[in-house]
Amino acid sequence: MEEEKVRVRLVFEDRRILSKYQKKQGLTRSWVVLNRKCHRTISEFSDHIFHTFSLCEACPHGLSLSMEGFVLPPFESSCVLKDKDIVCVKKKKESLLEIVGEDSDENVYNAIEVEERPQIRPGEMLLANEEFQKETGGYESESEEDELEEEAEEFVPEKKASKKRKTSSKNQSTKRKKCKLDTTEESPDERENTAVVSNVVKKKKKKKSLDVQSANNDEQNNDSTKPMTKSKRSSQQEESKEHNDLCQLSAETKKTPSRSARRKKAKRQWLREKTKLEKEELLQTQLVVAPSQKPVITIDHQATKEKHCETLENQQAEEVSDGFGDEVVPVEVRPGHIRFKPLAGTDEASLDSEPLVENVLWNGNMTKKKGQKWGTEKSGFSKRYAQDFNEDATTQPAEAETLANCPIDYEQLVAYTGSVKKGDVIAYRLIELTSSWTPEVSSFRVGKISYYDPDSKMVTLMPVQEFPIEKKTEEDDDFCMQPDTSLYKEDGSLEIEFSALLDVRSVKTSSSDSAEVAKSALPEPDQSAKKPKLSANKELQTPAKENGEVSPWEELSEALSAKKAALSQANNGWNKKGSSSGGSWSYKALRGSAMGPVMNYLRSQKEI
């Protein structure tokens, strides 16, 4: 008994049959199982391959199977195939003129003979030998026809080409020439093919009857159109090949990035390398400095600013040296002002040689005119007002200097009560761990409130330049081995809950009472604060009280009550005038009239 299922090896000789995906899977050489119950004949087996590999588009006319160079007929039984046989799969071609690139007369003649030859069916008798014997002069007729064919080939008219130009070996029936021809004319090659085919057919069918000749003429017309279609197909295939070549050339020449893109990429790489080098230098400097050599840790903002400016100048000098040489370097004279100076003179030049800029302040009511400086007016009153305002501005830094120079008695400071405001300067204490891991209350420290969250009640305190934060470091080995338990960050800021601060006192507030709070903290027992105050009724009040006799809290309360009374009197006076005139004063009216500068002057004097 033969096996019902046999393994067969398939080889696709023409790789254009399979798709790209199938080629990637390696199906050009594959195994297939042949079930002899289902596939009894070779045609059924070829249909099975046709459908399993989905070759409908690639092989519209079917497949032809062959083994060891011999074709397997479709009507043959599948028992011909044995286990592990190699079967070659080819594409079945059309019945007429499917040979690509062969347009000779012999191929055309052979194709027509194949069509005219009757199909041989099994069981029918062949009578070709008997008919050939009955005919007389069979060999002679064939020789005569061959001679006539040679004469026809010799008398084919040739095109005359000019001697100046070389004859091109390329086919002249290109797409460009077809586009130029508006009328539907046949090419010379097509005419030659049709003429040769018609002559051969006529000579071969001279001996037939008139009825048969009429039928043959119809077939002749059909045959003349077929070689035309063949030549068209060949030209289309040539055009498709040219198009594929152009696509391959365009794919090979890939677009390169532009010059600007390359420069930007190089600049980005340079910046990354520069930042990496800076980080490495900072780490090295931190590692070199030992922690035991730091007796007192102080946060100095001026030193950090100077270092930052130096690094900026060095970076700018490097950039300039890379591009234009060591000729000019930008130097920051003051905030927002940069001047270009030679590199040799930057170290020797000092900021004292630069002229001082006028401290110009804007009062909110002045506008700049042509040929006029910002913040100055041509009227005499504005000049006097600006002088008075500058005097007040100069007195405030003097008070700040006294605060910085003189030591503050934290016990005399007023307790910080009320709502926490941004910008207030407070003194506070903390509970810190000592070297023996025991809690201890620290000394008074001063910080400025930079951020406050009322929901979580978290406060961010920034250090003040006049009051640096000091941390005592012990020289014991045990203390050096312990980790850093400090609550402060690297920049000196402290982020803590407000309730965790102990004994909070106000050093300087953002309101107008800041100077009085600071003065109360200074140890000056025998000084009287005398300041004339101008009320709405133009009465001078000179309260003289000594700080030693009265507490600072009472002073603040009295000052607030006096200001409230002055404001209430001023409001009553304005309301009376407004009622008599029939309307109240608006902000626009104050700005448009001469009362605007007067009100600003009074506000600057802190009287209203």
Swiss-Prot record:
The modification Phosphoserine is found at residue 187. It is found in: Nucleus; Nucleus, Cajal body. Disruption phenotype: No visible phenotype, but loss of Cajal bodies. Residues 558-585 have a biased composition (Low complexity). Changing residue 23 to A: In NOD-RK1; Decreased RNA-binding. In NOD-RK1-2; Loss of RNA-binding. Pfam families: Coilin_N, Tudor_Coilin. One of its GO terms (molecular function) is U1 snRNA binding. Keywords: Nucleus, Phosphoprotein, RNA-binding. Contains a N-terminal ordered domain (NOD) (1-117), central internal disordered domain (IDD) (118-349) and a C-terminal domain (CTD) (350-608) with an atypical Tudor domain containing probably two large unstructured loops. This is Coilin. It comes from Arabidopsis thaliana (Mouse-ear cress). The gene is COIL.
